[in-house]
Amino acid sequence: MIDDILDKMTLEEQVSLLSGADFWTTVAIERLGVPKIKVTDGPNGARGGGSLVGGVKSACFPVAIALGATWDPELIERAGVALGGQAKSKGASVLLAPTVNIHRSGLNGRNFECYSEDPALTAACAVAYINGVQSQGVAATIKHFVANESEIERQTMSSDVDERTLREIYLPPFEEAVKKAGVKAVMSSYNKLNGTYTSENPWLLTKVLREEWGFDGVVMSDWFGSHSTAETINAGLDLEMPGPWRDRGEKLVAAVREGKVKAETVRASARRILLLLERVGAFEKAPDLAEHALDLPEDRALIRQLGAEGAVLLKNDGVLPLAKSSFDQIAVIGPNAASARVMGGGSARIAAHYTVSPLEGIRAALSNANSLRHAVGCNNNRLIDVFSGEMTVEYFKGRGFESRPVHVETVEKGEFFWFDLPSGDLDLADFSARMTATFVPQETGEHIFGMTNAGLARLFVDGELVVDGYDGWTKGENFFGTANSEQRRAVTLGAARRYRVVVEYEAPKASLDGINICALRFGVEKPLGDAGIAEAVETARKSDIVLLLVGREGEWDTEGLDLPDMRLPGRQEELIEAVAETNPNVVVVLQTGGPIEMPWLGKVRAVLQMWYPGQELGNALADVLFGDVEPAGRLPQTFPKALTDNSAITDDPSIYPGQDGHVRYAEGIFVGYRHHDTREIEPLFPFGFGLGYTRFTWGAPQLSGTEMGADGLTVTVDVTNIGDRAGSDVVQLYVHSPNARVERPFKELRAFAKLKLAPGATGTAVLKIAPRDLAYFDVEAGRFRADAGKYELIVAASAIDIRASVSIHLPVDHVMEP
């Protein structure tokens, strides 16, 4: 059928398929019965079409690092199944997920969106996720292909990575997704790879992806991430996104007629687009692109379970789990206590059905006999709190506000990211909008107004210009680097007074690749200052135990910018120190998208890492704190003692954050625990580490044989729960090559198994390895090579908690195709 359709197409029609129709849909060809399909952002939900802000509500799942922390592919596959259903509820046939870039520096703004520092764990998570999504008739899109481990100058930076490092660290998750999960789409990354944009890199998109791995699906660009006509399609990029076309269309037709692109190349890409439509069932039944909210009880329960399964208990001085009857006065303190920090920022952001804050979850778990106290202590937000409350938005044709508004609407939040406009009479390239709201302060004193805008804007309070985002506007880091840095100004306001807040916005005159990025965010907050910490200390003093909720939020952990350091932002470290000096019973609950330094670690009794676990945050946290379930997570990323213990953080800026348009992956294969192991650097908490509420004993590992053949072998380990509670343990299998001919890490994760055991129960971890698991990439031969000889199989509970090792022998060299 597909070839019949192609035979009837003109060149222009084939070319039309190779660019999006708009931001979220492909092109339809009605005369041939070719429907359009919709794609939607993930990975922790399905946002649907329209803006990155707002939209139809969706189930908000834990972010990828939280899924990686479960070490449970079966559970992740269940999440994928649910997310496939969420995508369909938004009329989408393609989910733009999962993200499988590697945790390299600890500072990547999208660290939260990726599973792990280890390629084997990342690959296992990705395969499970993809299998789940695609079981629902929705195509998964693995991204970002490849070496997109930083947000700094991401659209122009060249990631300079040697081939061995690519083959052993950064490519394996993509390879496994193709070979084991049959992923239907791949998204190229923004960056260059060794000087060539990934979207026009024939070695990457054709030689490796298609010829070596056998991928037959669609390769699409990241949004605005293609930069040429002939180069991209000749390299193997099928779909330019978003639409309408910028470098395809008439330009590609001309390139074919001028002999720069073969007609067969266009047909091959068009065929892959049609094949994608066939695979998602679009020819059988044209997709209904309508969007609706799908809020299922089973999704709620799964998200709650995932939150606990990914929670990592880093320290426990006998205080957890909390007995509800043991404490009369419980303090819940911190900037993340009453705020539900459920996800990261950027394109992964969705409108959740609902959110449960830690304070709400803890309060719901406690009986009325408990006295719960709350204090914020300090702020941790990167931007001023977004304006919340009813406001009128008037839209005008052109720049300026002298004509009558074309459209008027009411919204509840001072944040806008316009991909389209509410009236067909408006043009993104030439419109303006006026927002009018009333602000009533609760307290008298200094308030800070803040605003950031892609375009030009001014904020007035009672007619006075307070924030000027117009005169002197310069590009900064917000809204993916298209807006200015947040402009702030302090104003003294009186309690209970009504202030008229007006923001006037004009679309930018410049554009990005022919598309105007129009965005605005404004807010107001009263700074807490010393009084906030003093209130927290007094609250702690009056309480038996303190639950201290600290970390970051989705304006720190976000697409578009990297973190400045690995410390808790704002005055949170000061808050922890002050509270811990007042009350000896402090449990710190962390919410971050990656590792942080903990100079206060010795002063608190427990530390629980919750990540960003989705809409059920507060309930999942309460389940863990009060022992209804155990924290079952293990770290998917090493937590170093200091930022400089990361292999990518050196005195050489060319290694990170990059210099002169290049970032050198000079650490090579020594990423994460591979670096800590080999360089003998003690971590704060090792890869694979996590405490629980019960105890286990492990039996000696058993081998199916001592000689490795082509079919591999199996290691089994019996694990017994000797405690009085149900719990989980993760058996990790690492390979050590004592007689390696080339430099190799001390050990590398090759298999793992998570066992969930009742008290007194015994389970068996079954760990399978193959010759490829013993191999390194031989650059000269262009093959993976496992040299004959002795290998050690290390059975461990973390990268440093080694329980046993056994020796195997590889009788002959194994040379394997990549």
Curated annotation (Swiss-Prot):
Its EC number is 3.2.1.21. It comes from the Bacteria. Belongs to the glycosyl hydrolase 3 family. Involved in modifying a vir-inducing plant signal molecule. Hydrolyzes coniferin but not cellobiose. Keywords: Cytoplasm, Glycosidase, Hydrolase. Transmembrane segments: none annotated. One of its GO terms (biological process) is glucan catabolic process. The active site is at 222. Pfam families: Fn3-like, Glyco_hydro_3, Glyco_hydro_3_C, PA14. It catalyses: Hydrolysis of terminal, non-reducing beta-D-glucosyl residues with release of beta-D-glucose. GO terms for molecular function: beta-glucosidase activity. GO terms for cellular component: cytoplasm. This is Beta-glucosidase. It comes from Rhizobium radiobacter.
